[in-house]
Amino acid sequence: MRLNSLSPAEGAKHSAKRLGRGISSGLGKTGGRGHKGQKSRTGGGVRRGFEGGQMPLYRRLPKFGFTSLKSFHVAEIRLNDLAKVDGNEVTLESLKAANVITKDILSVKVILAGKIEKAVVVKGLGVTKGAKAAIEAAGGSIEE
């Protein structure tokens, strides 16, 4: 077997549709587009969600919910993210330096998710009751 002797399996490749090549090809004249109408024209077609003039579904349904602006500058981090910080002191700046949070985050809350093995000192971050218990059980502490 050589590279120049390789070929696809029989029937694995279909030949391309050759449109507008005579009546007997089956794809001559209208080229598989049918007669007249918007979809037969060059550049013809309708946008996504268009229902022929009927009020489309996305406009029939009501709007709901909103995006809280708080979500743009408040982050929740897991216990196992605390281990990614160099040293044993975890602050907002040290989390940014370790790429755990983005630079536009202004406040952080540590939640009880994942595990923590090393003892860390958490400074100036929000901590849930469960996360506080887990940090203290690992030998760490929380400072406001």
Swiss-Prot record:
Gene3D superfamilies: 3.100.10.10. GO terms for cellular component: cytosolic large ribosomal subunit. One of its GO terms (molecular function) is rRNA binding. One of its GO terms (biological process) is translation. It comes from the Bacteria. HAMAP family: Ribosomal_uL15. Belongs to the universal ribosomal protein uL15 family. This is Large ribosomal subunit protein uL15. It comes from Actinobacillus pleuropneumoniae serotype 7 (strain AP76).
